[in-house]
Amino acid sequence: MASESGGLTEYIQHHMTHLTPHASKGGFWAVHIDSITVSLVLGVLFCLWFWLKARKATAGVPGRGQAFVEIILEFVDGQVKDVFHGDRRVLGPLALTVFLWVFLMNAMDLLPVDLLPWITEKFGIGHFRAVPTADINMTFAMSLTVFVLIIFYSFKAKGASGYMHELFTAPFGKHPALWIPNFLLNLVELASKPVSLAMRLFGNMYAGELVFMLIAGLFSAGAGVAGWALYGAGIIGYTVWGIFHILIISIQAFIFMVLTIVYISMAHDHH
């Protein structure tokens, strides 16, 4: 039992290790080549697919691909229209990009756990994680980009003086004694937005990836009749969790998109 436990522990640790340059040990400032590579490839494929569908779009009866794209566009535009009351020409495409990009990165969790590591090992790459959104560095990078957009829209809608006035006078009032409490509360609110975005997405996807690895450990646990029983339980568990996980990856992509729209809308509107 101890050896089996150690084997499973080593298996999980191996699959949870990122590909970094120069054998870096990681940390917040580490460059995770696997997360960057997978996210960029998925982003390029998503943009290329939409570009091809846009080129082939017709005014007549749409094909299945065009109809699917139009459904997604209408769905995302409806979400933006319900929340944001300004010019949607920039925020609409941004929301679409966020939703589909995060969804595709989440969907990498549905690949067999050992598939990409097995492929990369053929090229001499020891570690390779397939799910960028299970990397806290990646989710924080995306949430900090949203944070920059929040600040940008705040200055754009209210001006520098108007935004600074809001930081010191909302929500308690304009009295000088309330300036510092107002400012501190607004700082906490601002900081909580990127943190909540990053941690929510990371936590759900990291947990989902870990569950897949624990289930995969059943495939090699035990021998004889017990081993085959665990193997069958692993297949059933993998299938059931995979079906349930489709809902999770869709909801998390939707939540990230909606919160991005809400936060930017709050920055755009005057208090």
Please annotate each region the language model reported.
Residues 1-271:
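Selective transmembrane helix interface/packing segments
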